[in-house]
Amino acid sequence: MAEHNELGKLGEDLAAEHLEKENYKILERNWVYKNAEVDILAQKENILVVVEVKTRSSLDFGSPQDFVKPKKIQLLIKAVNAYINYREKDFEEDINVRFDIVAIHKNGESFAIEHLTDAFYHF
């Protein structure tokens, strides 16, 4: 596996651990719809949380969250709409959707994790 793929996988594992510590229930990881992949789908109370994980080895070229581009946001919206339709019987009618980013960067020998809630709006 390429080094950047290993870093991305590690970042997703760290993000999932972080979310679980914050009492999120992980519903899916790497959920794919057509050409879109959602890194983590989680639930906290009546909120379906769509999490994009961005991991960087350094901040030399910008913060991890700066690399979530409009095209990716559009793909996430399509994917989460499909996911809700697919799992609609599993959710309460008043389920809310929130899009978060978990930004991770290497900080020496450890990793810094920043959880950005409501990172962008879907409607």
Swiss-Prot record:
CDD domains the UniProt entry points to: PoNe_Nuclease (cd20736)
Domain of life according to the entry: Bacteria
InterPro entries: Restrct_endonuc-II-like, tRNA_endonuc-like_dom_sf, UPF0102_YraN-like
GO molecular function: nucleic acid binding
Xref: PANTHER family: UPF0102 PROTEIN YRAN
NCBIfam families: PRK12497.1-3
Family: Belongs to the UPF0102 family.
The protein's name in its UniProt record: UPF0102 protein Fjoh_1217
Origin species: Flavobacterium johnsoniae (strain ATCC 17061 / DSM 2064 / JCM 8514 / BCRC 14874 / CCUG 350202 / NBRC 14942 / NCIMB 11054 / UW101)
